[in-house]
Amino acid sequence: MVLLAAAVCTKAGKAIVSRQFVEMTRTRIEGLLAAFPKLMNTGKQHTFVETESVRYVYQPMEKLYMVLITTKNSNILEDLETLRLFSRVIPEYCRALEENEISEHCFDLIFAFDEIVALGYRENVNLAQIRTFTEMDSHEEKVFRAVRETQEREAKAEMRRKAKELQQARRDAERLGKKAPGFGGFGSSAVSGGTTAAMITETIIETEKPKVAPAPSRPSGPSKALKLGAKGKEVDNFVDKLKSEGENIMTSVGKRSTEAAKVLAPPINMESVHMKIEEKISLTCGRDGGLQNMELHGMIMLHISDEKFARIRLHVENEDKRGVQLQTHPNVDKKLFTAESQIGLKNPEKSFPINSDVGVLKWRLQTTEESFIPLTINCWPSESGNSCDVNIEYELQEESLELNDVVIMIPLPSGVGAPVIGEIDGEYRHDSRRNLLEWCLPVIDAKNKSGSLEFSIAGQPNDFFPVQVSFISKKNYCNIQVTKVTQVDGNSPVRFSTETTFLVDKYEIL
C-alpha cells in the first residue's frame, strides 16, 4: 500500500485539512480533491473511485468526506482498514463533525495522521496508542512538578506565618509601650526614628512592572545596635530571592527580628515502605448559595525501596461517613480488602514492584450536598453610587482540616485602579496586570475558622465573579489512612512513612 495523502473535505471538494505523505504540491492536491466529487457515482454504493493515476477511498461523515488518495496498485482491503482508523481518529479530537471544528483542531489531526502513516505506509498502531503518542504524557514529570509545587507552597506559607508573627510581636510591643523587637540598644537621639520605623504599614504590591521593587530603606546612624544578626539577614535574603522570582510579598517597614527561623520545610523522612495519600477536589458553587457539583478523587500510592519488604499488606482505616466509593487495583485481593480492610496481592507469593509508585487504592466522592463543602465562600457586592462595596466571608465547615496557603482570588473591573481595602483578616495582593485581588490566608483551621474582607471599587456586582480558591492541606478530606503495615510471612510489623496531600483542582463560586 502506498498512501499519497489523507484529507477531510467538503462535499464540494474544498480541502479543510490535508496531509501529504509524499512530495506533492498544493496545487496538485487541491486539484485532486476538487475533482473528487465529480467522479462519485451516486447510483452505486462503492466507497472508492479510480482515475487513470490515483484511487480515492472515502467515507462520508455527515456533511464532510474522509478521503484517502492512494496509488492504483495498492491493496484495497488495507486501504479500507486504514480509512476506518482515520475516521475513528477525527471524533477523538473534534466534538462535532463540522468545518469550523475540524479547522480549529487541524494541527491535532495532522499529528495523529502522522502517527498512522509514515512515508506512505501504514504503521501498526491502534487508537489508544495514537492518543498516547500525541499527548506525550509523562507520569514522572507530573509527579516531579507536583512535588516541586507543594514544596514551594509550603515554603511560602511558612514565610507568611513568620512574617505575621513578627507583625503581631511589634503590635504587642507598641501596645505595651515598649520598643519593637530587633530595635533595642538605641541612643536617646534615635528613639523617635526607631519608633517610626517600627510602625506596621501594610503596602499593596502591584505587578504592573516586571522590575523588582527596591528593598525598604533602613534607619541609618552611627550606632552599632542598628546591625541585625545573621539569621535576620538570611530571612531578608530569602524574601529578596522570592521577589526576584516574581513573587509579591507583603512586607512591613522596619527590620525583621533575629527570632526568624528557617523558612523551608524539612524534607520528609522516607522509610523503606512509603505511602503517598493524595486527594484532589473539584467544586462549583452558586453565588446565591447551593452546591452545583463537588467531585473528589483520592489515591494511595505505595513506594517500596527495599526488596525484603516487597511482600507486605497494608491495614487501611476508613472513617468516612459520606458514602465514598472505593476501588482497589486489579492485582489486589478484593475479598481480603472487603473482609479485613487489608491491601495485599491476590497471589501472596508475588511481590510489589520495587522503586516505583504503585496505586493500590483509589476513591471517589461526588455530591451536591451543601453540608459537604469544606470551605464556604460568600461574596456580597452591593452598588453604592459610582462604586461597589464588596464583602467576602469564609467559613471552615470541616473543622478537622487545616488548610494552608489559602488564596481567594476575586476578579476586578479593568481600568478602575486599585481597590480601597476596609477591614481584612490576613493579607492581600492586588495584581493589576491580571485585574485580580488575592486574599491570602496562611492557615485556616478550627481556631481560625472564619474571616472577612471588605473593599470598595468602581464596578457592578457581576464584575466580581467567578471567585476562585486554592489551598493545600496535610490532612485528607475523606479520612482514609494506612494505620499498619505487616509482612505476609509471620505478620510482623514493618516501619513505614506517610505523606498526605489534599489539593484543589478547581474551586469556583460562579
From Swiss-Prot:
Gene Ontology BP annotations: endoplasmic reticulum to Golgi vesicle-mediated transport; Golgi localization; protein transport; retrograde vesicle-mediated transport, Golgi to endoplasmic reticulum
Domain (MHD) ranges: 270-510
Broad class of where this protein is predominantly found: cytoplasm
InterPro entries: AP2_Mu_C_sf, AP_mu_sigma_su, Coatomer_dsu, Longin-like_dom_sf, MHD
Gene3D superfamilies: 3.30.450.60, Mu homology domain, subdomain B (2.60.40.1170)
Subunit comment: Oligomeric complex that consists of at least the alpha, beta, beta', gamma, delta, epsilon and zeta subunits.
Protein's recorded name: Coatomer subunit delta
The species this protein was found in: Gallus gallus (Chicken)
Protein encoded by which gene: ARCN1
